[in-house]
A protein has these predicted regions:
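Residue-level recognition of well-ordered beta-strand positions that form the cores
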Residues: 18, 44-46, 79-81, 93, ...
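Oxidizing extracytosolic/periplasmic lumen-facing domains
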Residues: 77-80, 88-89, 105-110, 126
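Short, compositionally biased
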Residues: 54-70, 128
Length: 128
């Protein structure tokens, strides 16, 4: 996913960034060298939390892709592309990007529109 770093803050050996993408804005921990504000980066986005269907993940009727900050959490809207019945891992599509999620509970049907929220996101810069 392409993101632009709007700002960053260092504390306790962690780098927290505010980023924007063509789908909206979010907040995440940054892994790697300190990013430059205003620069564009190709990143991999990790959600390390186990998300629960019906609580952290909800079905949506709209078919838009979105990232937004709401009540100190980052909310994503996308399409459920696939899910593993064995371990609950699923792939969510946001435009031309995908996000892998670990989930538990009864999932939506593949190709459903969904919204999920988390307060734990890690961005890794992709090596070119």
């Amino acid at each position: 996913m392409k993101v632009v770093i709007k700002s960053y803050e260092e504390s306790n050996e962690e780098i927290k960034v505010v980023f924007s993408s063509k789908f909206g804005e979010g907040i995440a921990l940054w892994q790697g060298a300190i990013p430059k504000e205003g620069n564009s980066y190709d990143v991999e986005l990790e959600i390390p939390n186990l998300l629960k269907w019906g609580k952290d993940i909800q079905g949506k009727k709209s078919n838009c892709f979105l990232i937004e900050i709401l009540d100190n959490k980052v909310c994503f809207e996308g399409t459920l592309e696939s899910i593993s019945e064995e371990d609950g891992c699923c792939v969510v599509r946001l435009g031309d990007s995908i996000i892998l999620l670990e989930t538990e509970g009864v999932p939506l049907e593949v190709q459903s529109y969904l919204r999920f929220e988390t307060d734990n996101i890690i961005l890794y810069e992709n090596n070119r």
